[in-house]
């Protein structure tokens, strides 16, 4: 009886919440009819090209399509490491779109970066381009009033939310708990894909969401992240993947969301779309100017592009699951594991969360047992640079396994690393424009509460406090280079969540030059000035060391966190020119 009483209230609350989970067909039809009748149909353009701007990026993609054959595809690929080019490329492509724009993302906040992209998409819709936005509900648009305004803004703009909790745009704390208790498997399955696709010809895929910290605009903590821009036949794979997600039952239109539907039905007149209110309008104006500056685009994006052959876009299927009869849903995950398992000489891995799934552990253990195992270099987060403490704790627990059984060379990012990338230098050192590469001299550099499960989710997630001040950076890039032959840039964290629950996507480029570019980018983050190296402690008393390691191994085998305080390995500042200690 006491047990029943303990769970009676939570169960009652869940039942009350579930009673109003779905709308009636009549409510949905009525909201659809109201939006169709009263949506803003004004147009800012009457030209057949919908007033698209000229774009060297879209032009290069069109040329790649023209040069391609089924047997010999041609692609143009650009590695987007630095944040200003990554944001300017998006704006340029949105403004250059003539027919369609499809956006898929995990997080969309209403800070400067989020407002900027949303306003650009609204403008594109109003000049006649079909715009579709698909965002994961738990981490995006936590404002039913905003979504109500978007529903009326233009017939050319459609928004859907993936896997909304109890068919609502906003998840309250009690609903979050109820979602875990009543339907954990579905609640836990999130859409982690990131994609911007323009005219089914060129797309950007990778790790960046629409939030300030992904573009070096947060005042205190920003991410080192990465995308790849791909023009050519692989864009058709992107389009096919987006259609699967867009038409899946878990992707709900705005009129199907209870809190948005209620606002639509009670509107006396369609709400207007307000001008964005930027916290720092100067930097927004700057990147908007860069997005249409031919010299800037040439220096930062066109000159950095590579013309390559085979490129593939992979994505897991919607409603991904680890059930045996649904294995096809894990298509991208399977392909990544196969890539790594075929390595001959070197695997270079960058991930913010070094928490290996059982399948990944098996692959790396098998590689390390070879007579001549490949070298495995890992770039990941440190405790000082992460904002996902639970994930780091799990990584910390398995250091001995990673070093001894898998042969990893682990480098953990420092929070103030001065040269992990161009953005790092500009943000931390206040580098003036005269210090930029000569090809871009004079170019101006960039000087809400979220409920979640594990990992990075929102702008209120902050890293551990440090005694040192200044701008801090964390790692969010997810990439692999295998044998300098092919490379992957995507959203997959190589952890159990990415393996079994989140849908993931990314591009795989089969080109030596691109693999070399990506390899150099990752290795820059592992340099002594940018990262600590993880290596075994030096034994002081052999017998005590053996006892300590035995206890440590037992503690590591315990569920969840490892409580033994005397660790097998620790962090070192590696002296330049020296090799780290080996297990």
Model-predicted regions and their roles:
Residues 1-9:
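Bacterial N-terminal signal peptides that target proteins for export
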Residues 4-5, 14, 184, 336:
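Structural motif marking the loop-to-transmembrane transition
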Residues 8-19:
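Bacterial N-terminal signal peptides
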Residues 21-194, 198-583:
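Charged, low-complexity intrinsically disordered terminal segments
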């Amino acid at each position: 009886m006491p047990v029943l009483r303990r769970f009676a209230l939570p169960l009652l609350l869940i039942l009350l919440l579930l009673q109003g989970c779905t709308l009636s067909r009549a409510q949905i039809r009525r909201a659809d009819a109201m939006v169709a009748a009263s949506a803003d149909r004004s147009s800012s353009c009457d030209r057949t090209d919908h007033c698209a701007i000229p774009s060297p990026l879209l032009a290069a993609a069109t040329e790649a399509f023209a040069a391609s054959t089924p047997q010999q595809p041609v692609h143009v690929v650009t590695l987007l490491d630095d944040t200003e080019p990554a944001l300017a490329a998006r704006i340029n492509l949105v403004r250059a779109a003539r027919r369609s724009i499809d956006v898929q993302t995990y997080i969309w906040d209403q800070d400067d970066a989020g407002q900027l992209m949303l306003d650009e998409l609204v403008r594109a819709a109003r000049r006649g381009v079909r715009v579709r936005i698909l965002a994961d509900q738990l981490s995006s648009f936590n404002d039913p009033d905003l979504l109500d305004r978007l529903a009326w803004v233009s017939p050319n703009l459609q928004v859907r939310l993936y896997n909304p909790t109890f068919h609502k745009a906003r998840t309250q704390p009690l609903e979050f708990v109820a979602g875990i208790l009543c339907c954990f498997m579905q609640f836990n399955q999130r859409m982690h894909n990131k994609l911007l696709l323009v005219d089914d010809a060129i797309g950007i895929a990778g790790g960046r969401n629409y939030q300030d910290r992904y573009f070096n605009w947060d005042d205190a903590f920003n991410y080192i992240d990465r995308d790849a821009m791909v023009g050519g036949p692989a864009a058709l794979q992107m389009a096919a993947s987006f259609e699967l997600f867009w038409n899946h039952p878990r992707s709900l239109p705005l009129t199907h969301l209870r809190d948005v539907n209620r606002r639509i039905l009670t509107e006396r007149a369609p709400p207007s779309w307000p001008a964005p209110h930027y916290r720092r309008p100067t930097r927004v104006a700057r990147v908007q100017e860069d997005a249409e500056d031919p010299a800037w685009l040439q220096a930062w994006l066109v000159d950095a592009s590579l013309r390559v052959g085979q490129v593939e876009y992979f994505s897991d299927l919607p409603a991904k699951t680890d059930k045996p009869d649904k294995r096809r849903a894990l298509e991208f995950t399977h392909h990544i594991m196969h890539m790594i398992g075929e390595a001959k000489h070197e695997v270079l891995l960058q991930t913010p969360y070094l928490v290996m799934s059982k399948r990944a552990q098996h692959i790396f253990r098998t590689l390390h047992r070879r007579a001549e195992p490949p070298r495995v270099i890992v770039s990941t987060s440190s405790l000082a640079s992460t904002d996902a403490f639970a994930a780091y704790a799990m990584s910390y627990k398995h250091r001995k396994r990673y070093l001894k059984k898998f042969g990893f060379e682990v480098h953990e990012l420092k929070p103030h690393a001065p040269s992990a990338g161009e953005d790092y230098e500009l943000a931390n050192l206040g580098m003036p424009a005269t210090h930029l590469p000569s090809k871009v001299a004079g170019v101006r550099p960039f000087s809400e509460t979220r409920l979640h499960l594990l990992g990075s989710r929102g702008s209120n997630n902050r890293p551990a406090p440090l005694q040192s001040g200044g701008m801090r950076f964390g790692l969010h890039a997810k990439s692999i280079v295998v044998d300098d032959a092919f490379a992957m840039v995507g959203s997959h964290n190589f952890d159990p969540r990415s393996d079994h629950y989140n849908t993931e996507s990314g591009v795989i480029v089969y080109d030596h030059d691109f693999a070399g570019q990506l390899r150099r980018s990752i290795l820059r983050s592992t340099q002594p000035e940018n990262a600590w190296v993880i290596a075994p402690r030096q034994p002081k008393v052999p017998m005590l060391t053996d006892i300590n390691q035995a206890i440590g191994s037992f503690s590591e085998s315990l569920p969840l966190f490892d409580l033994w305080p005397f660790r097998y390995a620790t962090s070192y500042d590696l002296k330049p020119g020296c090799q780290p200690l080996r297990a």
